[in-house]
Structure formats: structure tokens, C-alpha cells
């Protein structure tokens, strides 16, 4: 824990709160330990442009809070700081607007039948989302297919090419595609 109010630098990122360090496979894993509201004020700024309207930031704060609280975590940390879970870039992503969005939605979460939902979100759906049961084994009534409203998104259409060897490595149980 640093007594410096400006935070603790790790590489190019600055963090508040406490840092726990673990050695895993000859690499150092840095885990930032802090309260959820401080965490969220950075997540909101990491997941979306902070110049967007405050109501959009508030919606992101609620979705991100729900998502974070729903995660089970592991014995080292609760949630990954990448797109695997939610992007968390430390203090550099925290702004007055993200702090305001998080404070004004404090404790608000998304529920279905009085339980936290699996509040998944994305930066781009590529035109349409899928029904949950078509992607995962579980059917969530609140995760149903809808068309994307934002055809101007630069990631609306994309492509990725794979070689036969890459597909075989990605899908070894079925010998590729």
C-alpha cells in the first residue's frame, strides 16, 4: 500500500489501494485490492469512452457492478483485468464523470427473479447478438438475440483468416474444421 495519494505505478499503469504480488511460473502476477466502487470508476472509463453521455456511463456502471459481483473468482483474485472479464486500466481510466456515474448508481445491480444476472456486454456484436443457449449451455431469458443498433461502429464487420494448422490447433478434439 502506498502513502502517495497519486497511486502506485506498475509499468505504464497507476493503481490505488493495495497491491499483492505473486510469483507464478517465473512471472510476477500483480493483484490490485480495492473496493468495488473505486474499481468500477476505472472499469467504466476502461470499457467505454468517458466523453459519452453520463447516462451511458451510469448504465455501464450498473452492468459492470452486476458482472463483477456475479463472478466467482479464484484463490488469487476475483476478476481478470482484461476483456476476458472486464477491462481495468487503473487510475488512468478514472475521471470525474466515471466517479460521478458510479457514485450516482451506488449499489444498483441487475437482477432476474431476485438473483444477479450474468450481465454480459461487448463493444460490438458484429450486427446481432445471439440467444444465450446458442452460445453457452444455459438459457437466460434476459439474454436473447437482438439486432445491433450501431452499423457505424468500425468493428461492425470484421474478418479473421486461419490456416488449416491453426484450426486444427484451435479445435484439437475434432481435428480442426
Predicted regions: what is each one?
Residues 1-177:
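Conserved, single-site charged/polar hotspot
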